[in-house]
């Protein structure tokens, strides 16, 4: 609003609007992506979920990497298809940053790892009332490999998980 009093002009705002401008840096890419997926629950790939949340927060990959303390190239690989394993500590930081439960970011395989692969393998073996040796023979793997899985010394590969536990 503008008013003139004794040849002196005074200006005062009628309304002050304050809102964050959240627009992704690559607007067209984000627009196409958001048309494909309107909600992260529709996605099965972790890469898509990470990209969706990053676009929602209008961040660059390098900004996300800086916030969670990893190399930008590492984070770029997280958003590429074909990656099987995502370190839990990085996913926990991302979940905290986006204020979502970590389970909503993970796929079935990474949830298997997150919920203690060793315990799950042991429970499945014990539910079938098998010894480690018998269970290893059933799966067609060495006894040492099964022991390492059960004690969380070695991470089971996704291809193995799909073959035996999916």
Name each model-derived stretch:
Residues 1-5, 9-11, 15-16, 32:
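Short hydrophobic transmembrane-like helices used for membrane targeting/insertion
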Residues 17, 22, 106-129, 134-137, ...:
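Short, charged recognition helix plus adjacent turn
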Residues 25-45, 103-115:
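A detector for short, charged/polar N-terminal pre-domain segments
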Residues 48-67, 119-134:
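Short basic helix-loop element that most often maps to the first helix and adjoining turn
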Residues 50, 64-65, 75-78, 105, ...:
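Conserved hydrophobic/aromatic packing and binding residues within compact polymer-binding modules
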Residues 69-85, 110, 141-156:
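Recognition helix of helix-turn-helix/homeodomain-like DNA-binding domains
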Residues 89-104, 157-166:
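DNA major-groove recognition helix of helix-turn-helix/homeodomain DNA-binding modules
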């Amino acid at each position: 609003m503008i008013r003139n009093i004794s040849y002196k002009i005074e200006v005062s705002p009628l309304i002050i609007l304050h809102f964050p401008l959240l627009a992704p840096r690559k607007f067209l890419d984000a627009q196409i992506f958001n048309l494909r997926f309107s909600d992260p629950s529709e996605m099965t790939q972790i890469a898509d979920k990470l990209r969706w949340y990053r676009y929602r927060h209008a961040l660059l990959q390098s900004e996300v990497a800086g916030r969670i303390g990893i190399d930008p190239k590492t984070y770029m690989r997280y958003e590429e298809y074909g990656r099987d394993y995502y370190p839990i500590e990085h996913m926990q930081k991302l979940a905290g940053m986006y204020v979502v439960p970590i389970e909503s970011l993970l796929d079935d395989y990474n949830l298997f790892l997150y919920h203690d692969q060793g315990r799950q393998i042991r429970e499945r073996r014990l539910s079938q009332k098998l010894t480690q040796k018998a269970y290893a023979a059933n799966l067609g793997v060495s006894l040492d490999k099964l022991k390492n899985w059960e004690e969380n010394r070695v991470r089971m590969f996704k291809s193995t998980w799909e073959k035996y536990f999916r």
